[in-house]
Swiss-Prot record:
Family: Belongs to the OSBP family.
Biased composition (Polar residues): 424-433
PROSITE patterns found in the cross-reference section: ANK_REP_REGION, ANK_REPEAT, OSBP, PH_DOMAIN
Location in the cell: Golgi apparatus membrane; Nucleus outer membrane; Endoplasmic reticulum membrane; Vacuole membrane
Protein species of origin: Saccharomyces cerevisiae (strain ATCC 204508 / S288c)
Note on domains (UniProt): The ankyrin repeats are required for targeting the protein to the NV junction by interacting with NVJ1.
One Gene Ontology term, aspect cellular component: perinuclear endoplasmic reticulum
Binding site residues for ergosterol: 834, 962
Segments annotated as ANK repeats: 51-80, 96-125, 196-225
Biased composition (Low complexity): 443-462
Lineage: Eukaryota, Fungi, Dikarya, Ascomycota, Saccharomycotina
Lineage top rank: taxon: Eukaryota
Protein name: Oxysterol-binding protein homolog 1
Length: 1188
């Protein structure tokens, strides 16, 4: 078949468009240039020109960012001769009036929108055929907020430039600024300076600058604009008559100014007749953040200040077709401003200020624009009410106000621009697919498809307020929304230094429509910062985390695929309708069909992944909501229950008081009568019987009204539990298993001061020799540190609840909190604080009695929580592979720990001493339920004791699981750590065990920090009891035939309670907490020593040791910004290392620990491989990873 001559065939616009789309989609700028050079010829052809001019429109829909940057750089930003002499207009409008910025905003391509807004020739105020600006095309509120911030920043910079030009009297520069269409829209030459309250015209009238005043009046300055004090510009001129003779220069200037202003006034009066916009009520529209409630904080809302004097808000622009979420009448409102706040202000309305809207702008300039618009509306509304109250309008007022009262609210919303008042009925907004009328079918179809997508997204947006349904499936793609008022920015508004704003309006009347779902309480706190990552970087981003959750993942990719498919199909349909077809057409058709198929596959995959993730997020959110609901219910029930108990106790107290009073009043009469009728002996008996009856009656009443949980005194830790069992006990008081403690093994209450621990048994001697041989204590010759370099804790103050409120129901170990919540210790160092009172284990090893050893081991497991009181600051999360070593010559022990897992976070630890070993894993599951932060310990902990008198076995193995930890008092702003639950400490060698009971912190302080326990032998016979407060001291007592009840005296410590174990059944002190030093971060004296870095120790430390961590060191030095930056850096480095391992297919293995089955408990545990201390001695750490 003979091929047609392509040179004689008319150029096909659909064919060019398909080829251009394919080249743009490939992402290669050289390929794009090659296509234009070969296929887009001749350049002067109308079809070629039409496709070329819309190249940027197509690019923002299908091309990657790199190609768009190249197009802008080569064909938009340059004025030189370009490739093929192509020059593109950044603000080019397609057949629907959309610019590339409109399309990028609609398609949620935030990176493209930001790039375009940074171009010097961009004009974001261009209206499309539906009279919408680009910002009003946004479906994504995050992008709309970003556009608003960039606009405010641009206005601030331009206004400052304008102000400089005014000061320099640079008329040429002033003309160039005003010649920009964007500046003409955004800058208001009649705006007020927020500090002086003057317009630019007022300012130069005061300066008596006739030339500048004339220039201002020629360029739109309003001679009727009043300043803050209500004065017109002409009122600032001194009283002179035109016929007066100019006796001096000042009078001549005043005469000239007066003539100039009067002439401008006369000319302006003509404009008033034809254009009543100059005297309309202030109107404004845009996004503001509104305080919703205590749990959700600030949320972005669309606000409309309409000409009828009402300020209303909606979820977003698309929600304006429905009823507003709340509205205030400006005539009944006042503004409350704080000069220290640049972003926040408050509107007070209603009777006596019962309605308060706390609002927050995205930028100080945006906030000032809103403030002045609202102040103007309040003043205008009040003036109008005064006119209505005093009488009818004057003819001039009737001209400017009479018609507006008859116009509906919705019509007024579309009258904010002179262009809108003359426009026909608004139609649907469509995006660029082609540029002639033959594409109506494809355009409408595409609109319907995208409309459904937008409906679904919009419904998701509505979930953050109260129930809201929108079943209108036929609404247009973009509802015709009112234009954001832009002509309200003062040229003088941008000045260096803080702005002082004062309220000038008072409130007397109630609002028409109260806020329906977002009430504000005076008690609600306004803490900025919703997310951890925001405060980590020192920014304010309230509500953005919530907005990010609305739109879901892959939103930009999905929009690109949808638009690509739509454009491809529409262009393909065009091509198939072209009658002049040849082989090149069919090749392009095949390529296009393959592209569409590929896009459909990608779209289906992304949609499936998106659906799974959205379902997971919805499920998680539902669980979080359920937790909130249950927490509120539990709190309410708890408060009700306690209230009922208080009422019952008060009633009981009153009844008891009445009964006692009655008995006391009757008793003297009984005794008097008895003395008259009988002898003294009989009266004594009767009186005694009466008193006894009274006491019995009182006792019966108390027993009858006693609650089930009131069976013990708050000060008594131990009941007489052995009272019943004592009857079956042996007659002998001393048990055969409880021999008298040998004198030479009498324990000491405090740790020994000398550095040589007395070792007796051969296992102890062997272990001590090993510690010395491996150089465990080398580098620790210096005295321990007793203070920090910081004198006080001056961390930035951030409310704990303000951060945790967005983390309800989540595992906090996987979340990053701001560095200001940290203390300068690592979690590995926190683990080492468990052995602060290791001398208790040294004492335990001195006893022959295994049950007595169990008593002291149990006391040791409870003593490790004393350091947690007043320590709510969070330690630094260890990096994977991070280690920490610690040794004490006075305690003769060495400690080592390693972060062996990152998800879940697990720290393995191993401590060795001649008389004992302590090891285990810190593996916890944490969650926050809205009221408390709960930590559940998952790993087992072990202690190996090598007794001095190892008659039967050389070593004993103990194991236990730590109690549940809870941070309470978060809602009350007084967080504290509490322990609760039962813990069983087991001696697997002898069969002895101890049951410890940690009492949860109750409603009152009674019973706080309380712990009690019982020691049993292998035959379940109770031998010892212990009790006390885990934050202060623990006492022990031997169970004897006389009973086992034990009381705690926090203040007085009798001599009988000291000096070691007592076998006579008296109380003795086992452990007492050390006094806390007054240092920053509430560190203990032991914790102060952990992060110290003496010079002798540095050469022996592994490069992974926590002491060398830069963010932790900066935190200790008070360099909080550096600490935050370093923390972010090391975490990024850790993620990069993980990604590298995944790419190589490597599995991470800890360097110093290996997971095995424990030989006694048969549970998995992390065993120390013993290599660290030898490598430390030889300075052989060259194979350690670089994690810092």
């Amino acid at each position: 078949m003979e091929q047609p001559d392509l040179s004689s065939v008319a150029i096909s616009k659909p064919l060019l468009k398909l080829k251009l789309l394919d080249a743009l989609r490939q992402g290669s700028f050289p390929n794009l240039q090659d296509l234009l050079k070969k296929q887009f010829q001749p350049l002067d052809d109308p079809n070629v020109q039409q496709v070329l001019h819309l190249m940027l429109h197509y690019a923002v829909q299908v091309a990657p960012m790199a190609v768009i940057k190249e197009i802008v750089h080569h064909w938009v930003s340059t004025t030189n001769t370009t490739f093929l002499n192509i020059h593109l207009d950044l603000n080019e409008r397609d057949s629907n009036g959309n610019t590339p910025l409109h399309i990028a905003a609609y398609q949620s391509r935030g990176d493209i929108v930001a790039f375009l807004l940074d171009q010097p020739t961009i004009n974001d105020c261009v209206l499309n055929n539906s009279h919408l600006q680009a910002i009003e095309m946004c479906k994504n509120l995050n992008i709309a907020q970003m556009m608003q911030v960039k606009r405010s920043t641009y206005v601030a910079e331009t206004a400052q430039e304008f102000r400089t030009a005014f000061n320099n009297r640079d008329f040429g520069h002033l003309e160039s600024i005003l010649s920009s269409p964007r500046n003409a829209e955004l800058l208001d030459i009649n705006g007020m300076d927020p500090e002086t309250g003057d317009t630019v015209l007022h300012e130069f009238v005061k300066k008596r600058d006739v030339i500048m005043c004339r220039w201002l009046l020629e360029h739109g300055a309003d001679p009727f604009k009043r300043d803050r004090k209500g004065k017109l510009p002409i009122e600032l001129v001194r009283k002179v008559n035109e016929n007066d003779t100019a006796t001096n220069t000042k009078i001549a200037i005043d005469i000239e100014l007066k003539k100039l202003l009067e002439r401008a006034t006369r000319e302006q009066s003509v404009i008033d007749v034809t254009n009543n916009n100059l005297h309309e009520a202030p109107t404004y529209k845009g996004y503001l953040k509104k305080w919703t409630n205590f749990a959700q904080g600030y949320k972005l809302r669309w606000f409309i200040l309409s000409s009828d004097g009402k300020l209303s808000y909606y979820i977003d622009q698309a929600d304006t077709k429905n009823a507003c979420r709340g509205s205030l009448n400006m005539s009944s409102c006042s503004l409350h401003l704080d000069s220290s706040e640049k972003l926040k202000f408050e509107i007070i309305g209603g009777n006596n200020g019962v309605i308060r809207w706390h609002l927050k702008g995205n930028h100080p300039i945006e906030t000032n624009r809103w403030v002045w618009a609202i102040q103007g509306a309040i003043r205008y509304a009040k003036d109008r009410e005064i006119l209505l109250h005093n009488g009818p309008y004057s003819p001039s007022l009737a001209l400017s106000h009479g018609l507006s009262s008859k116009v509906s609210n919705k019509e007024n919303l579309h009258a904010t621009s002179k262009r809108l008042t003359k426009s026909p009925h608004l139609s649907k907004s469509t995006l660029t697919q082609n540029d002639h009328d033959n594409d109506d079918d494809s355009t409408n179809n595409n609109n319907n498809k995208s409309n459904n997508d937008y409906d679904d997204n919009n419904n998701n947006n509505n979930n953050d307020d109260d129930d809201y349904d929108d079943d209108d499936e036929s609404r247009p793609l973009i509802e015709p929304l009112p234009l954001i008022s832009s002509r309200s920015q003062s040229l003088s508004e941008i000045t260096p230094g803080p702005h002082s704003r004062k309220s000038t309006v008072s409130s007397t009347r109630a609002a028409d429509i109260p806020s329906d779902d977002e009430g504000y309480s005076e008690d609600d706190s306004d803490d900025d910062g919703n997310s951890s990552y925001t405060m980590e970087n020192g920014g304010e981003n309230d509500g953005d985390e919530d907005l990010n959750a609305i739109y879901g993942p892959y939103i930009q990719k999905l929009h690109m695929l949808q638009r690509s498919i739509s454009i491809e199909l529409a262009s393909l349909n065009e091509l198939l309708q072209d009658k002049q077809q040849h082989d090149e057409y069919w090749n392009t058709v095949n390529t296009s069909i393959e592209t569409v198929s590929e896009f459909f596959d990608k779209l289906n995959r992304l949609t499936s992944q998106r659906e799974k993730r959205m379902i997971a997020q919805m499920t998680k959110q539902r669980d979080v909501n359920n937790v909130w609901i249950q927490s509120v219910k539990d709190l309410e029930m708890e408060l009700v229950d306690k209230d009922e108990k208080l009422v019952a106790l008060d009633k009981e107290r009153k009844n008891l008081k009445k009964m006692l009073q009655k008995k006391l009043n009757n008793q003297p009469q009984v005794e008097t009568e008895a003395n008259e009728e009988s002898d003294d002996a009989n009266s004594m008996i009767k009186g005694s019987q009466e008193s006894t009856n009274t006491l019995e009656e009182i006792v019966k009443f108390i027993e009858a009204t006693k609650e089930s949980d009131e069976d013990s005194d708050a000060d008594e830790f131990f009941d007489a539990e052995e009272a019943a069992s004592d009857k079956k006990a042996n007659d002998s008081e001393d048990l055969t298993t409880n021999k008298e403690t040998p004198a030479n093994a009498k324990p000491q209450e405090e740790a020994p001061e000398d550095e040589s621990l007395i070792v007796i048994s051969s296992p102890q001697v062997e272990k001590k020799n090993q510690l010395l041989k491996e150089g465990s204590f080398v580098g620790y010759e210096d005295p321990v540190r007793t203070k920090l370099a910081l004198d006080e804790d001056n961390r930035p103050k951030i409310g704990l609840w303000s951060v945790l409120k967005s983390m309800v129901g989540q595992d906090l170990t996987k979340l990053t909190l701001p560095v200001s919540f940290n203390e300068p210790t690592s979690l590995l160092q926190r683990v080492s604080e468990d052995i602060e009172y290791s001398h208790i284990l040294d004492q335990a090893a001195t006893f022959e009695d295994s049950s007595l050893r169990m008593l002291y081991v149990a006391a040791f497991t409870a003593s490790m929580y004393a350091s947690t009181t007043n320590r709510v600051s969070k330690p630094f999360n260890p990096l994977l592979g991070e280690t920490f070593e610690y040794a004490r010559t006075d305690g003769q022990y060495r400690f080592f720990t390693e972060q062996v897992s990152h998800h879940p976070p697990i720290s393995a630890t191993w401590t060795e001493s001649p008389k004992w070993d302590f090891y285990g894993e810190c593996n916890v599951d944490s969650s926050f339920n809205g009221r408390t932060f709960a930590v559940q310990h998952l790993g087992l902990w072990y202690i190996t004791i090598r007794p001095d008198h190892n008659i039967s076995v050389p070593e004993e193995t103990y194991s236990w699981k730590k109690p549940n930890n809870t941070v309470i008092g978060i809602l009350m702003g007084k967080p504290q750590v509490d322990n609760s639950g039962d813990v069983k400490v087991t001696n697997h060698t002898t069969g002895d065990y101890c049951m410890l009971h940690y009492k949860a912190h109750g409603w009152t302080s009674a019973g706080a920090y309380e712990v009690r326990g019982e020691v049993f032998n292998k035959d379940d016979k109770k031998l010892w009891v212990l009790g006390g407060h885990w934050n202060d001291s623990i006492y022990g007592k031997k169970v004897t035939a006389r009973g086992g009840e034990l009381t705690l005296d926090r203040i007085k410590t009798a001599n009988s309670a000291t000096g070691g174990p007592k076998l006579d059944g008296s109380k003795f002190l086992i452990w007492k907490a050390n006094e806390r030093p007054s240092v920053p971060f509430n560190l203990t004296s032991f914790a102060l020593t952990l992060n110290a870095l003496p010079p002798h120790l540095i050469p022996y430390l592994a490069p992974t040791d926590s002491r060398l961590r830069p963010d932790q060191r900066a935190m200790e030095n008070g360099e909080y910004d550096k600490a935050a930056a370093e923390k972010h850096r090391v975490e990024v480095k850790q993620r990069a290392a993980k990604k590298e391992r995944e790419q190589k297919g490597e599995e991470y293995r800890p360097k110093w620990f290996v997971q095995e089955e424990h030989p006694v408990t048969k549970s998995l545990y992390w065993k120390f491989n013993g290599e660290y201390w030898n490598k430390r001695k030889n300075h052989d750490f060259k194979d350690c990873a670089d994690i810092f």
